Amino acid sequence: MEVIPAIDLLGGQCVRLYQGDYQQAQVFNNDPVQVARTWAEQGATRLHVVDLDGAKQGESVNLGAIAKIAAAIDIPVQVGGGLRTVESVAQLFDVGVERAILGTAAVDNPDLVTELCAKYPGRIAVGIDARDGKVATKGWLETSAVLATDLAKQMATQGVAAIIYTDIHRDGTMAGPNLEALRELAATIEIPVIASGGVSSLADLVNLVALEGIGVTGAIVGRAIYTGDINLAEAVKAVGPQRLQDVFPDDGTAIA
């Protein structure tokens, strides 16, 4: 399983939110480039970057910082937040980003997703951020009537490379991932699912590895690697692609 460290950018700084609340942003570092280098040095095979300002404003805001991050490390960078036009996605790819993550646009403008998947095959993912099973949009400030599972099925037919699923109630809480919701989502689609939100320990990652067989191929880790609850290098060795020990598949009895 791919263990993917997250960098959330707000005002050019590396922050973490609590349940998506911008008023509860905690600054962990004012040099996101150095943070990116640290995670790459510890064995990360991919970096997840969110432009929080962009998600709120509907356009890329931290493009300069993102460009510096992409130039500073040799691993693929995926970016989400405020990507609602072909031009905004093209800008990211022009500065070295490997994968773009669409969120609000997937709900409001699914034709854009289709167009981008055709233009950039294999490089478009959709982030489904759910609150009580319903898709949240516009930087999690609004909750739609769309079910997360329905959106995932629709996006899978439109050619997206992966679904990044975030349970907002778990995000930043260190309460563990929502295994039941992940299991349900992964079972409905054939494309990879990347889990996000609530991962707080190596045990949480092991529980997610047990879902690899049904398509959960990665886990985004945020607050826990900044607080030290998870040592990224150890996590990559324990559950990453080169791990020495297999984990038994989840038969549905794991507690979410």
From Swiss-Prot:
This protein's UniProt keywords = Amino-acid biosynthesis, Cytoplasm, Histidine biosynthesis, Isomerase
Q: In which pathway does it act?
A: Amino-acid biosynthesis; L-histidine biosynthesis; L-histidine from 5-phospho-alpha-D-ribose 1-diphosphate: step 4/9
State the active site. D8, D129
Q: Which GO terms describe its cellular component?
A: cytoplasm
Reactions performed catalytically: 1-(5-phospho-beta-D-ribosyl)-5-[(5-phospho-beta-D-ribosylamino)methylideneamino]imidazole-4-carboxamide = 5-[(5-phospho-1-deoxy-D-ribulos-1-ylimino)methylamino]-1-(5-phospho-beta-D-ribosyl)imidazole-4-carboxamide
Q: What is its main location?
A: cytoplasm
Which EC class heads this enzyme's classification?
Answer: isomerase
The EC number of this protein is: 5.3.1.16
Q: Where is the protein situated, by its record's location annotation?
A: Cytoplasm
| Biological process according to GO | L-histidine biosynthetic process; L-tryptophan biosynthetic process
Gene Ontology MF terms in the entry = 1-(5-phosphoribosyl)-5-[(5-phosphoribosylamino)methylideneamino]imidazole-4-carboxamide isomerase activity
Spell out the InterPro entries in the cross-references: Aldolase_TIM, His_biosynth, HisA_bact_arch, Isoase_HisA-like, Isoase_HisA-like_bact, RibuloseP-bd_barrel
Which Pfam family name is an example for this entry? His_biosynth
Member of which family? Belongs to the HisA/HisF family.
Protein name as it appears in the record: 1-(5-phosphoribosyl)-5-[(5-phosphoribosylamino)methylideneamino] imidazole-4-carboxamide isomerase
The species is Picosynechococcus sp. (strain ATCC 27264 / PCC 7002 / PR-6) (Agmenellum quadruplicatum)
